[in-house]
Amino acid sequence: MNEFHQFEPYTLTSFDHAFPPAFYHFVALSFAIQKPQDAIPTLESAILRMVGELPFLTGEVGPCPDAKKNGVMRVQPSLNTTDKSSIVRVKEHPRFVLSSTPTPGKGTGTGQHHARCVDLSGAIVPEFDYSSISAPVFRAQINVLADGIVLCLAINHMVIDGTGTGALVDILATVCREGEGSVNYLRTCGAIQESTRRDLQDIGTQGQLPDGVQSSDDPTDGAGDIFEPGKSYANHTLVFSDAHVKALKGRCNAILAEMFPAASTGPPNPGTTVRDQRSLVSSNDVLTALLWMSISQVRSDPTQPREQSSVSVPVNTRTRFSPSLPDNYLGNAVLVTESKLALSELQCLNDDGHLGETSTQGIRLLSLLAHRVRSSIAAVDDESLRVSLRRAHHASDWETLLARPGDVVVSSLRSWNSFGLDFGPTLGGIAALELVPTFAIEGECIIKPCRCDSSGSGIWEVMVTLKPEHMHALRENQLMRCVLQCDYPVEVYRAG
C-alpha cells in the first residue's frame, strides 16, 4: 500500500523542457552535531512531512501519453515510491568526518588538501538509476558521520530549477524547525506550485506570435550528450574575496562610463539600483566575464582553431514577469541567455602586463565582456518572456526546447539564504554546502551561496568543472591569479 498522498499527473511547462528528463542537482548539506544519531528522526520526519504535503516530489518524470506534440513530458505518480525507504535512506559512515574547508588567507594549500581528499561523492548521493526514464523527481540520503550529518538531496532539474532548489532547502528548514506546525505552510506552498504552473501554461496560449517570430522548432544538435554523467573532470572551488571583486567591478564601471558616457549619466532607471543596467555592471557580471575570458583562454587549442566562444547565463525570470512569479515557486523559471566572444579578442591578453598584474587591455576586455553579459540579461523582460512562452507553445516538437549550453556556463546561486537558515534545536544551521558534481558539464561554473570566511570577510565561491590540464592552466592564468584568493578540490567529507 502506498504511504504517500496521490496526485494528478501534470504536464511540465516549456521552461521545464529546457532540461533533460534525467538531469539532477545533488546538494550536500553538512551539519556539525555532537550526537549525529539524534538528528536522524528530525530529518526523516521533516522530509516525509514535506513530500506528504507536496506529493509531486514522490513522482517521476515520464512521457505525456496524450500529448499532441512530440517530446512532451509530465510528472506522474511512481509505482516505485511506496514507502519512506524509497524517498529517504540512512547510511552510516563512522570512519569519516566532515570536510574542513581550507582557510583562504593561508594560500591555496591545494597539494596538502588534495593529498587527503577522497572521492566519496558516489557514497553520499541517493542510489537510483540516474539514466532511466521514468526519472524520480526527488530523493534524499542522510549520511551519518563520526562528527555530523551530511544530507544529500537529489533533485530533478526538469522539475525544479536552481532557485527552486534553494527554496526547497528553505522549506525543509522550516519543516525541521516547526514540525507539525508547518502543515498549513506546506499546503500554501503546494497551492502556489499548482497556480503558478497554470499561469505559465496560460501565458503560452495567449495571443499569436508577433510578425517575424518563428516557433521554437530549431534543432538542438547534440545537446543531449552534454548532460551525460560519468566523464572524468577536475572539479575545484575557486575562492575570491568580495573586496577584490568589488574593486574589479569599480575599474570596469569606470571604463564603461568613459565608453558609454551618455548611458552612465542618463536619468535613473527605477527598475535598478544603477543608472543604466545595460551599461553599468554588477559584481556577478564581472565575475562571470572573468571566468568566461580566462576559461576561453586556457581552453584555446592552436591545432583546433575556433573563431568564437560563447557563455550561457541562466537568468531567474521570477521577478522579470509582470506581475512577478512567487519566490517560492519551485518549477523552472529560467531563460538561458548567450553572449559571444571572438577568440581574436583574447590576443590582447598576451601583449602586456606582468605576472600578478592586470593589463590595461585585459581590464578593458573584461569590462566589454561584462557589459555583453549585462546587456543579454537586461534584455529579459516581461514582453520577451511572454513571446518565448508563446513560441514554445507553437512548437510541434518540444524536444527542440532543450537548452544547448555555451562553451562556458555560469550559474549563480548566490541569492540562496542557506547559511542563514535555522533547522531547529537539534540540527541548528548549515556548517557547509557543496554541490556534488555527479552531472558535471565541462566549462560549467556555479557561483555558490553567499557566505563569509572564518575571519568574517565576504567571499565569492565558484565551483568550476574542467579537464585536469585546463584546471591547472586556469589556476596559473595571469588575470585569474590577480584576484584568486585560493582554490581546492570539491570535497564533502574525508577520512577521519
Swiss-Prot record:
One of its GO terms (biological process) is alkaloid metabolic process. GO terms for molecular function: acyltransferase activity. Its EC number is 2.3.1.-. Keywords: Acyltransferase, Alkaloid metabolism, Transferase. Pfam families: Transferase. Pathway: Alkaloid biosynthesis. Campesine G features good insecticidal activity against the global honeybee pest Galleria mellonella, which supports its future application in the development of biopesticides. It catalyses: campesine A + acetyl-CoA = campesine C + CoA. It comes from the Eukaryota. Residues 203-228 are annotated as: Disordered. Residues 203-217 have a biased composition (Polar residues). O-acetyltransferase; part of the gene cluster that mediates the biosynthesis of campesine G, a dimeric indole piperazine alkaloid that shows good insecticidal activity Galleria mellonella. Within the pathway, cpsE acetylates N13 of campesine A to produce campesine C. CpsE produces an inseparable mixture of two acyl-atropisomers due to the spontaneous rotation of an acyl group at N13 of piperazine ring. The non-canonical non-ribosomal peptide synthetase cpsA catalyzes the first steps of the pathway by producing L-tryptophanal and L-valinal from their respective amino-acids. Belongs to the fumigaclavine B O-acetyltransferase family. This is O-acetyltransferase cpsE. It comes from Aspergillus campestris (strain IBT 28561). The gene is cpsE.
